[in-house]
Amino acid sequence: MVDKRIYQMRSDNRKATDIAQLIKKLIATHTTISTMESCTSGLIASMITDTEGASAIFPGGYVTYLNETKIFIGVDPKVIERYGVYSKECAEAMARTVQEKLHTDIAVGITGTTGNLDPNNADSVQGRVFFCILIHDEANCFEVNTDVTGMTRHEIKQMYAARVFDALDRLAFPDAE
C-alpha cells in the first residue's frame, strides 16, 4: 500500500509534501493536471486519484513504457533519436504531449531506469530518472540520480513519485510552508 505522506531526506526545513493536501490545493484552485509516465508505471496518476474529488482536476494520463508507445501518443520520434528516451528533453516532450492532448494547466512527464539497465536503449543508467513539470507553458525539468541498490521496484517508484510531488508542490504553490 502506498503511504499518502512520503518523506524524503531534505537539505532544508520544509516538510516533505503531503500528497493528499497537495491534490486538495489543486482542486481548490481548479488547477488541472495530467501525466505521462514511463518508469513510475502510472503510480503518480494513481496517487493523484487516491484523493476524493480528484476527477475534477485529473482528466487522465498515459503509461508509456515503450518508445513506440510514447511516439504513438505523440512524442516526436526525433526527440528520442536525438536526446535518447532517458533525457530531460524526452521528459519535457512527454509533458508537453499529454498537456496538449488533455488540455491541462499542469502536466508531468517522467522517464528513467529504475532497476536493471534497458538493453533496448543505450542511454539507460540504473537509478537515473528525468521528470518535467510543465505549468502552463513553463517547463521545469529535473534529473535525479539515486543508488537504488537493495530497493524493490515499488520502493523506487514511490521514491521518484515523491520527488515529483515535492517539486510540484514547490512550483505550483511556492509561498506555502
Where are these regions (language model features)?
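Short alpha-helical segments enriched in small residues
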Residues: V2-E177
